[in-house]
């Protein structure tokens, strides 16, 4: 099957993003680095600033991080810190300030060390989901707005906020369309291509992301009309994010006869689900408050989302993916596994890191799982 032109364009845009980003900085635009899907990018864009995801998906930077951080810590946290300490991530080096958030204990404490290396602002994300917690979160988003205005010198007007809300909602709309197309049999796109799309959506200029998504949807609609695509056991991945560089599990699944048709993760549905309904700071805050991350207490809607995706995408089996020492997702995995087994949905739990040492072992386990379902 011919390669998708939109994915080739995605790779080209990613290859030239560093040069483009530094040119945008030379034009006077501020860059806000971020780690997490909870950071409301509409606020940053409304001040003509640039939100950009930060590196954290490589094993190479972990040794330098372990000079300061414990070995028994999530590899994403160590890799991120190592990239900044080693000064090898262009997005870190371009960032005028980094926005952190109180999602997990490891990141919170790592930020105390990272703020020695780069200016930081930490958003307090309440872990409860009640009205009092929502009020706290709305205030945190208002504080972010004040910070962004101060850092950029640009006033965030109602008009600019409306423009950026509409633009980011457009990205969400296009990802929804992509997921609709993935319901087809055969699947019109490989999971690895979609993973790269999510990974780079955190990095690319938003207008480039929109253009690539529009082109991709046209190509996939054509494939669906022709009945072209990828056969195999249909797999939903759920769990920890897979930031750029961390493709191991998806690669293995598709090597052994599976096809990934959905991702319930921050490099997946949590990135785009739910539109901002309205144009106020409060409306923006409410949308992000709904994100069902495992760091939240009594995160029952995540379980329901997974069951819904299994049905909508006609999934044959679920791969629950956890990074080593990610206690939040690992513990919540027990609830997810129990709920899916009650529904008769096959599930396998995988715990791994960024190294290649367990690739063959994972390949054996995933191959057996796919044969079983």
UniProtKB/Swiss-Prot annotation:
It comes from the Archaea. Disulfide bonds: none annotated. Keywords: Lyase, Membrane, Transmembrane, Transmembrane helix. InterPro entries: FldB/FldC_alpha/beta, YjiM-like. PANTHER family: 2-HYDROXYGLUTARYL-COA DEHYDRATASE, D-COMPONENT-RELATED, DEHYDRATASE SUBUNIT MJ0007-RELATED. The chain crosses the membrane at residues 32-52. It is found in: Membrane. Belongs to the FldB/FldC dehydratase alpha/beta subunit family. The keyword RNA-binding does not apply. One of its GO terms (cellular component) is membrane. This is Putative dehydratase subunit MJ0007. GO terms for molecular function: lyase activity. It is a single-pass membrane protein. Its EC number is 4.-.-.-. The keyword Disulfide bond does not apply.
């Amino acid at each position: 099957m011919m390669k998708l032109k939109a994915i080739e364009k995605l790779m080209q845009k990613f290859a030239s993003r560093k040069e483009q980003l530094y040119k945008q900085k030379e034009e006077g635009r501020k860059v806000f680095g971020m780690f997490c899907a909870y950071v409301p990018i509409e606020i940053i864009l409304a001040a003509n600033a640039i939100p950009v995801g930060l590196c954290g998906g490589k094993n190479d930077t972990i040794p330098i991080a372990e000079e300061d951080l414990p070995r028994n810590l999530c590899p994403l946290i160590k890799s991120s810190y190592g990239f900044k300490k080693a000064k090898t991530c262009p997005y870190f080096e371009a960032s005028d300030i980094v926005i952190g958030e109180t999602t997990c204990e490891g990141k919170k404490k790592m930020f105390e060390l990272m703020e020695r290396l780069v200016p930081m602002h930490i958003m307090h994300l309440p872990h409860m989901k009640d009205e009092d917690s929502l009020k706290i979160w709305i205030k945190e988003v208002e504080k972010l707005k004040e910070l962004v205005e101060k850092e950029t010198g640009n006033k965030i007007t109602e008009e600019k906020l409306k423009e950026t809300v509409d633009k980011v909602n457009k990205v969400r709309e296009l990802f929804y369309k992509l997921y609709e197309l993935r319901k087809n049999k055969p699947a019109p796109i490989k999971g690895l291509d979609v993973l790269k799309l999510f990974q780079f959506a955190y990095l690319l200029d938003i207008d480039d992301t929109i253009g690539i998504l529009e082109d991709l949807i046209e190509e996939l609609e054509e494939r669906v009309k022709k009945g072209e695509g990828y056969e195999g056991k249909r797999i939903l991945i759920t769990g920890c994010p897979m930031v750029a560089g961390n493709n191991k599990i998806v690669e293995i699944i598709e090597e052994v006869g599976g096809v990934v048709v959905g991702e319930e993760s921050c490099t997946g549905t949590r990135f785009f689900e739910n539109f901002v309904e309205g144009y106020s700071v409060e409306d923006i805050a409410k949308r992000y408050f709904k994100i069902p991350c495992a760091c939240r207490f009594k995160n029952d809607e995540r379980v329901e989302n997974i069951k819904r995706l299994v049905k909508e995408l006609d999934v044959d089996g679920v791969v629950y993916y956890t990074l080593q020492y990610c206690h939040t997702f690992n513990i919540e995995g027990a609830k997810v596994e129990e709920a899916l087994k009650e529904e008769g949905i096959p599930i396998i739990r995988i715990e791994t890191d960024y190294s290649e040492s367990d690739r063959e072992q994972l390949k054996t386990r995933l191959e057996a799982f796919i044969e079983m379902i």
